[in-house]
Each structure stands twice: as C-alpha cells, then as structure tokens.
Amino acid sequence: YPFAFTLTITYALEGKTLTCNASVANPSDTEVLHYQIGGHPAVMLPDYDKDAEVIGYMRPEPNEGLSVVRASEQGCFGGDRYAVPQTEEGLIPISVETFSNEALIFDKWQVNAMTLLRADKQTEICRLSHGAPVLLVWQMTDLLCPYVCVEPWYGMPDRIGYSVDLDIRPYAQHAMPGEVSMHNLWDIEFCL
C-alpha cells in the first residue's frame, strides 16, 4: 500500500449488540491518505442444509426500489445494475441462485440495515446496521455454505478495467495530514 497509516479497530458488547468501530490515522505531515475500509462479519445460519433450496432470508432496510451491481471478473464489477431477487414479502432468499454471480453490492447508501431470518421467514437471527455508503452481501458461488457475509464498506470494489487514481475512486475516504478519521463499521444486534 503506498501510504503510511495506523489502523485501530475496537469492539464493544452492550447487551445483545456488538459494535465495531475503526479509526484510521494519517501520520504524514504532507500527504493526504486515500483509503477504503470495511467490515467482514459472517453470520452462521442455523437452518443450513446443503441440500435445501433456501437456508434463510435477508430483510433489507429500506426494502423498496433496490438495485445492485454484481461482482464479476476477479471481484470487480461492470456498470450494469440489476434488480434484487426478492420474495413478495420483500425478503432476499439465501440460496445458490441469489449468489450465482457472487456478491450483491448495494451502493449509494441504499441499505442502512440488514436483518437475517431463519428459513421460516419469521425468526430473526440478527440485525446488522451501519452508516457506510456500500453494503456488500455474499456467499460462495455454486455452493450453499452455513454462513452469509454482510459487509459494510466505505469504498467500492474496482470496476472492470479500472485505471483511475485512488483519490477519485467511488466512496474513497481521505484523511488529511495528521488527521484521524473515525468510522462505525457495524452494529450487530443478536436476536436468538
């Protein structure tokens, strides 16, 4: 990485809520630090069955008018937008089909929280909230696994063929010389 920085991650547990915060310090006296940062929480799914069609659901907040970009070549994305696969109740199934093209990337501050539900569509597992502009949700492609990753990001995966400087990447963060930037990566409220 071409910049010096100090990263501090803190976790706090209060009741049933686990909070993850990050501080990014720029030790330089002269250079602006350009960076992206995100979390990588994975949630185990209690109804995992490798032979099931759907092993749980996700309820985004808000859940109307959503669209995503999809990861493709080496985790990069193209410019096309796609409809979010949702049930009539506005739930996103956790299935091989949903993640057939790897990640669902909600950008533009579309989703500020995601509740994970058991396969019965009623029982809440947990609710992840965040303040990041991007929420990336993924599971392994072509194979159900016993978890789903719900990742808030202050930044965005690269576009296919990307050749733009770090300072003008979508949702890039910038710390001025000597500055410490604070980010709430996520809060997870456990419901089970």
What function would you assign to each model-found segment?
Residues 1-41:
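Acidic, contiguous internal or C-terminal segments within carbohydrate-active enzymes
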Residues 117-161:
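Glycine-rich active-site loops that engage anionic ligands at enzyme catalytic sites
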Residues 13-15, 24-28, 41-45, 62, ...:
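Beta-strand elements of well-folded, non-transmembrane domains
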Residues 22, 173-190:
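Short Pro-Gly-centered flexible turn/kink motifs
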